[in-house]
Design a protein with these regions (language model features):
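Generic structural signal for well-ordered secondary structure
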Residues: 2, 8, 26-30
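DNA-recognition alpha helix
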Residues: 3-21, 53-54
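Polybasic low-complexity intrinsically disordered regions
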Residues: 7, 30-178
Length: 178
């Protein structure tokens, strides 16, 4: 994931500039982003997001009358997630990756077609995001380990969001996992 970010920023210097990077100098390396993610307190980012949502709501940009919730897999940076790895036991629950001792074994559908039953296993996490469907902007996010089922966190996400932004009179959209 960090490699993708570094590649994206190098290939989209305008985005890098808008993110605050001085594009006349070398962009941060993989290891700089890795160190940042490991050492930075997620609570700070959550508080910044909350402040931005409240500001955008006050400005009329975020409207919580129509909200949606979905999750996406976040693969851990481990060789066991490498499709070129042919280890027979790479997706056994007792074969925890040494590179990331916090990640868990998860499964996600490899296709959005209802008649296809393709599943992929992965070691990692899940990012659950509540969005304002009108603007498309995120309102709240929660990252869990990959084995956590979507339905078990839905009420927590809605309650946490409602603690700072009222969402009682809204239309709620989610997939069958919730």
């Amino acid at each position: 994931m960090i490699s993708d970010l570094v590649d994206y920023l190098h290939n989209n210097l305008l985005i890098a500039y808008f993110c605050g990077f001085d594009i006349s100098r070398p962009l941060p390396s993989y290891w700089t982003f890795d160190r940042f993610l490991k050492n930075f307190d997620n609570k700070v980012l959550s508080e910044i997001m909350k402040t931005q949502v409240l500001f955008l709501s006050k400005e009329g940009i975020v409207d919580t009358s129509f909200i949606g919730l979905d999750s996406t897999p976040v693969s851990a940076n481990t060789s066991q997630n490498n499709p070129k790895s042919f280890l027979s036991n790479k997706f056994k629950p007792r074969n925890q990756p040494r590179a990331d001792s916090d990640c868990k074994l998860g499964v996600h559908t490899a296709s959005n077609q209802t008649n296809e039953k393709k599943y992929e296993f992965y070691w990692g996490y899940k990012n659950h995001v509540l969005v304002d469907c009108i603007s498309g902007l995120p309102i709240y996010e929660m990252t869990t380990t990959a084995e956590v089922h979507d339905a078990t966190v839905a009420l927590d996400i809605l309650a946490a969001t409602h603690s700072f932004q009222p969402i009682t009179d809204c239309t709620f959209l989610a997939d069958k996992g919730y």
